[in-house]
UniProtKB/Swiss-Prot annotation:
Protein's job: Inhibits calcineurin-dependent transcriptional responses by binding to the catalytic domain of calcineurin.
Coiled coil: none
Entry annotated with the keyword RNA-binding: no
Residue numbers carrying Phosphothreonine: 182
Phosphoserine: modified positions: 113, 117
Domain of life of the native organism: Eukaryota
Name of the protein described by the UniProt record: Calcipressin-like protein
Alphabetized UniProt keyword annotations: Phosphoprotein
Keyword Transferase found: no
Length: 211
């Protein structure tokens, strides 16, 4: 007659101290590799690892019989040869609230699967939007606004106006633009804007040879 499958597995050992921290950690790593990464175990129904130090044993309460059976199958691996795995006589999950199955003083851990990548609710049918080609950074927008506000060149220059206006002015000097008529080749005179760079202020230390 085969073993009755329950959701609770008892781990013992006659070769080592099963409740030693190193062995507990070794079992945790083994469960993570063989169970938690293969099954989606969430915090609502975690895999419970209960350490009974006084009784020198560990209880594994699985979310389902299917998972407990996979734990038993995986326990036959060579890395678990120092540990003994066996089913409990009754389901621990269903009977934890009953007084006669109350777990004695123990350490309890709740193990869950790592987050899936991508998550289970990810919609693979959605396509990523194309990059926005017309969005400017706030720096570009600020520079554009300053350029428009400065009005370096009039929108509709007066063709009969041969005056001068300032292109750039600072404490050091100024750059001015003079409008002057030019011949367009057909005998018609047109205004053309050109930049006239002013000479820097002359120093008292300059000599005539520097001109």
């Amino acid at each position: 007659m085969g073993n009755i499958i329950t959701d609770t597995i008892i781990i013992t050992s006659d070769k080592c101290d099963i409740v030693d921290n190193d062995n507990v950690e070794r079992i945790q790593v083994w469960l993570s590799k063989n169970i938690l990464r293969k099954f989606q175990i969430n915090e609502n129904e975690p895999l419970q690892l209960i350490i009974l130090k006084r009784f020198k044993r560990i209880l594994l309460i699985c979310p389902s019989h299917d998972i407990s059976q996979h734990v038993m199958d995986a326990s036959r691996a060579l890395e678990m040869e120092n540990f003994n795995f066996s089913y409990s006589l009754q389901d621990g999950q269903r009977n934890l609230t009953k007084q006669y199955l109350k777990v004695p003083e123990s350490e309890k851990m709740f193990l869950i699967s790592p987050p899936a990548s991508p998550p289970p609710e990810f919609d693979f049918s959605k396509c990523e939007d194309a990059p926005q080609r017309h969005i400017q950074s706030h720096i570009q927008q600020d520079q554009q606004q300053r350029l428009e506000a400065s009005q370096l060149l009039p929108n509709n220059p007066d063709k009969n106006n041969n005056g001068t206006f300032t292109l750039l002015k600072s404490k050091v000097g100024a750059i001015t633009i003079d409008r002057c008529p030019t011949n367009d080749g057909n005998g018609q005179m047109q205004l053309a804007d050109h930049v006239k760079t002013a000479f820097p202020p002359k120093s008292i230390f300059d000599t005539d040879d520097d001109d």
